[in-house]
Structures are given as C-alpha cells and as structure tokens.
C-alpha cells in the first residue's frame, strides 16, 4: 500500500491557495466547495433503491457527510432522488467499474455539493406514464437550481427527456470534465399546446452568478450545448466562464441564450457531425434577448469549428451578427483563472480524460469513438432503439458494471484497514476518517480518496 505524507499531492494543491480547495485538480468558481468535509462517512453497501446501506438513504440525509461505495453497478431508482447539500459523493471509491444511477431523475438541493466520477443515465422507463399532459417527460438526468458552492467533476450523463444536465441560478459553481450526451429527442416530452411528443434532445441550461465550465463534452444534443440561462427565472446576475469544452454533432444550435449576462467563450472545439444541419454547422453562438432583457456581453476568442478555416481565423464569423455595440466585447470578463489550453489541446485532453474515466463504461467509450470517427446520431430511446420500444428491450443499453473485490474496512470509515495501518491510522477507529492528520487541510478520508486518482 502507498504511504502518504503531507507533501504527497504537491505544494500546488495547497501552498498557493489562500483557501482549501475541494480536491486536487478542482478549478474555477466552485473549486473552494467544502462538500461534506469533516462530516461522517457513509458507506453504500448495496444497489437497492432504498433502505439501510442504499445510496438513497445516504443522499437524502441532511447532515455533513462523505458518501463512498463498497459496491459497483447500476442503481435502478424507483422514484426521483433528491440529493441534500453538505455532501461529497465519491463515485471513484466504488470497486471495479463504478456506479450508475438509472430510471429516474436526480436533483440537487442545498449548498456545498461535490460530485465525482458518477454516471447519471436516466432513460425513459417511467417517462410515458403521464401520457400527453403538460409536464410529461420534463426530467433532466441531473439538475440543480440555486445551489451555492457546487462542483461536478468527471461525471457522465445521458438519456434525459428534458435536458441532460441543467445547473443555474446559484453561485460559485464549477462543471468540469463531464460528458453530456444523448438526450432522448423524440421521447415523451409534452407541453401544453403540443399535438405530439416534442423533439427535445437538449444538452443543458447552465448559468449562475459565477460559473466555470471547462473540459466538458457535449455530444449528440440537438441544441442547448449549453443554453446560457441569463438573468431569467429570478437570477439577478450571471457570469459564466466557458473554456476548453468540446461540442460534437449538434443539430440546430450549439450555444445560445444568455439574456443580460456576462460570458467568456474561449478556446472551445466544435465538431459538426452527421446530425448537424448545414445551416448550423458554421455557427457556434447565437445570443438571445427578450422584450424585458437585452443581449448579454460576450468575449469570444480562440474557438475552433473543425474544418472551418474562416471561423478559426476570425471567431466573429462563427457567431450571430448583432447590430449595435456592446454585445461582443474586446476584453474578457474577470474570472478565476483556469489551467488554459488552446482548442486543439483541449480536444485531445477530453479524449483522454473526460467523464467517469477511472473506468470508462461502454457508453462513454462509444461516444468518444463516434466523436473521433465523425459518426453517431441523435437518438430517441436509450440504446438507439426506435421511439416506443418497450423498456424491457431497451434496458440492454445500460452496460453491466462489474465489481472487483472490496478491501477489508472493519470500522466502515471508508478507508481500507491496510491503508490505515500503512499511514499511521487506527483501522478500528471510525472517527479518524474526519480528522485532519495526513494533509494540511484534507481530512484523512479525503486523502485516501484523492490517492485513488493519483
């Protein structure tokens, strides 16, 4: 086992920061999220929807906590799940192939939330039950509204009936290294006035008073890659730093929205695909306004559309022309610095590391292959089946996630006994997980979890 010291993560992880960061590699406005630091460790020991040892029971508690996994596999929810704040959920602690949440939407409530290395692949099992009534199929695979101090890192989301992942209206948020892919387009989304199910394969609505988004991959979404929320829905201000992301195979629009907000759109890589309409292939940004809210302010620089030299030389050729001054600005909005890459470098980094990549599942591997080869399509049902396919047939879309042997952890504090002994901790003392001993500010359980990703 690896013996750790306070210098294991390198001085860059703490000496150069005035405040403790969420974990090594956390960047942007959400990097100071505390999550469940200092709270109790809760161990998920089964894949049941509810009950002792279930993910639901751990997620719905309101006390400060760190959630780890002693199992791997897919958790098939029987109802929507709400994750309460003051929590760190360490998907990378699962043995073997990791964790997936399926069948119902997951919503974030409250502040101080850290999510890492999880999969949210909802699907359409319960989406048709309401019939053609307003609100049917209005679910994101993962969503959060008005959450403060939130960071979502290396997660993989897909198969929604509204947006894949929407996060807006909060403050101090980072979305980094996530896969947002394959919303279900012609599924069971219905709103008042519709005559049929809507085509609603959208990526996400993103925004907040301060939000950083970097090294995320959008794939096979017809639009909202993302839609910037702007100062709508009660938001008084919005500042989004959108850098080093990849958008592949949009259909109608890549990025749009942003009413009366402030945006940096820098060094992103856009790759049209088989579903991209020719009229949309040369445009990566379409700002929005309403009668009450004017256009936002956009700093646009260093973005690339694959194969479009005109846009790559001059980004103003890839955005919707807006008459009048003040919409496209010459200097970036002030933000927390990120580790910067140019668009080509970001594309290569995303290929290697995006999503729940400690053990990539077959879905993410396929999406990466499709992006590289210029293939894939907008889908209506998980697995690419036709609309109306019975769930019992389409459930084969969820890959089998196999568990490896769990290491002995007799005190159930989330740290293996051998690791505790090797690092001077007591494998019979549950309380030492929450103590700061092995690092200047990470608790012992955090040091262990961070060591899994070295």
Give the predicted meaning of each segment.
Residues 1-16:
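Bacterial Sec-dependent N-terminal signal peptides
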């Amino acid at each position: 086992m690896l013996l750790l010291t306070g210098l294991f993560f390198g001085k860059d992880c703490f000496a150069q920061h005035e405040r403790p960061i969420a974990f090594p590699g956390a960047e942007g406005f959400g990097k100071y999220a505390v999550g469940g630091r200092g709270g109790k460790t809760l161990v998920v020991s089964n894949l049941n929807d509810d009950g002792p040892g279930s993910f639901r029971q751990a997620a719905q508690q309101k006390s400060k906590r760190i959630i780890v996994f002693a199992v791997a596999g897919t958790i098939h929810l029987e109802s929507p799940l709400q994750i309460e704040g003051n929590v760190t959920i360490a998907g990378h602690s699962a043995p073997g192939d990791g964790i997936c949440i399926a069948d119902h939407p997951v919503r974030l409530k409250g502040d101080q939330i850290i999510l890492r290395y999880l999969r949210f692949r909802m699907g359409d099992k319960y989406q048709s039950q309401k019939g053609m009534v307003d609100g049917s199929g209005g679910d994101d695979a993962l969503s959060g509204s008005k959450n403060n101090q939130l960071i979502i890192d290396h997660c993989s989301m897909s198969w929604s009936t509204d947006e894949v992942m929407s996060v807006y209206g909060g403050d101090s948020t980072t979305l980094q290294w996530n896969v947002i892919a394959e919303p279900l387009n012609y599924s069971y989304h219905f709103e008042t006035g519709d005559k049929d199910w809507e085509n609603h394969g959208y990526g996400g609505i993103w925004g907040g008073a301060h939000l950083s988004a970097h090294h995320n991959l959008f794939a096979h979404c017809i639009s909202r890659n993302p839609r910037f929320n702007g100062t709508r829905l009660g938001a008084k201000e919005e500042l989004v730093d959108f850098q080093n992301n990849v958008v592949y195979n949009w259909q109608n629009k890549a990025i749009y929205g942003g009413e009366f907000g402030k945006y940096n759109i820098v060094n992103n890589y856009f790759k049209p695909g088989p579903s991209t309409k020719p009229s949309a292939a040369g445009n990566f940004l379409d700002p929005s306004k309403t009668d009450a809210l004017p256009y936002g302010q956009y700093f646009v620089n260093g973005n690339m559309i694959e194969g479009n030299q005109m846009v790559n030389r001059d980004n103003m050729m890839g955005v919707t022309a807006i008459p009048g001054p003040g919409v496209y600005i010459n200097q970036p909005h002030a933000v927390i610095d990120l580790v910067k890459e140019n668009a080509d470098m970001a594309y290569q980094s995303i290929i290697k590391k995006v999503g729940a990549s400690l053990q990539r599942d077959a879905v993410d591997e396929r999406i990466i292959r499709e992006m590289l080869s210029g293939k894939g399509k907008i889908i209506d049902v998980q697995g690419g089946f036709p609309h109306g396919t019975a769930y019992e047939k389409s459930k084969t879309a969820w890959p089998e996630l196999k568990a490896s042997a769990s290491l002995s952890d007799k005190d159930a504090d989330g740290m293996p006994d051998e690791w505790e002994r090797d690092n001077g901790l007591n494998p019979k003392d549950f309380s030492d997980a929450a103590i700061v001993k092995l690092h200047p500010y990470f608790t012992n359980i955090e040091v262990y979890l961070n060591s899994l990703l070295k």
